[in-house]
């Protein structure tokens, strides 16, 4: 997914974001106001990735395939599509988003442009689930739940090139930092609640 990918919002939240972009672009044209549009991946902070519902069987029981697997004990879900590919998602740590916003501030070459901001790379479920299992001591359940798989990445090449955007927080770093934050350790993590 890059800046030229057609915007096709599904749901009210996505529609509100698309409409806001259009309003900003219109205002920029009519009033000459310099505007830069930053499109964020799903933003997580303060260890929110640790509680991500799609990682836990107990939180995904609304899916009939997964509900049948519930035996009363938590399991981490290593979800894959019908071809056996682990799900893939591209998220962003709030620290990288703050960095991206800072990179865009005052950069004339960014005026009138749209940029994707996300973490350094997308993650696959196996990357996240194996690390979570090791750290939380929760067993893994490998499942192909059917339906539309989660499998996408954002292209952040333009933001890297034009803005100097250099995200640092991959999924493993987000998990490790989130757990350290929960233990009360001194981290640079940003609370989001």
Please state what every model-predicted region is.
Residues 1-14, 44-56, 66-69, 78, ...:
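Catalytic loop of short-chain dehydrogenase/reductase
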Residues 1-37:
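Catalytic helix-loop patch of NAD(P)-dependent Rossmann-fold dehydrogenases
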Residues 11, 15, 89-95, 123, ...:
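Residue-level signal for the nucleotide or nucleotide-sugar donor/cofactor binding architecture
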Residues 18, 30-33, 45-66, 103-115, ...:
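Glycine/proline-rich active-site loop of Rossmann-fold NAD(P)-dependent oxidoreductases
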Residues 37-44:
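Conserved SDR Rossmann-fold cofactor-binding beta-strand/turn motif
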Residues 58-114:
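Alpha-helical substrate-binding/gating segment
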Residues 88, 98-147, 156, 189:
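Mid/C-terminal beta-alpha module of Rossmann-like enzyme folds, strongest
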Residues 171-193:
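Amphipathic terminal alpha-helices
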């Amino acid at each position: 997914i890059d800046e030229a990918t057609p915007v096709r919002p599904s749901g009210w939240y996505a529609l509100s974001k698309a409409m806001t972009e259009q309003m900003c672009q219109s205002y920029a044209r009519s009033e000459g106001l310099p505007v830069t549009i930053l499109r964020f991946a799903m933003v997580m902070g303060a260890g929110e990735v640790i509680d991500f519902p799609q990682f836990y069987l107990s939180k995904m029981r609304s899916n009939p395939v997964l509900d049948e697997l519930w035996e009363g004990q938590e399991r981490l879900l290593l979800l894959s599509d019908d071809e056996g590919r682990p799900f893939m998602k591209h998220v962003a740590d709030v620290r990288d988003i703050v960095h991206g916003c800072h990179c865009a501030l005052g950069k004339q070459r960014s005026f009138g442009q749209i940029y994707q901001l996300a973490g350094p790379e997308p993650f696959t479920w196996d990357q996240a689930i194996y690390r979570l299992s090791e750290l939380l001591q929760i067993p893994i359940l490998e499942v192909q739940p059917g339906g539309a798989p989660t499998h996408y990445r954002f292209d952040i090449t333009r933001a890297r090139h034009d803005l100097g955007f250099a995200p640092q927080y991959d999924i493993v770093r987000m998990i490790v930092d989130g757990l350290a934050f929960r233990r009360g350790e001194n981290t640079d993590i940003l609370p989001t609640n």
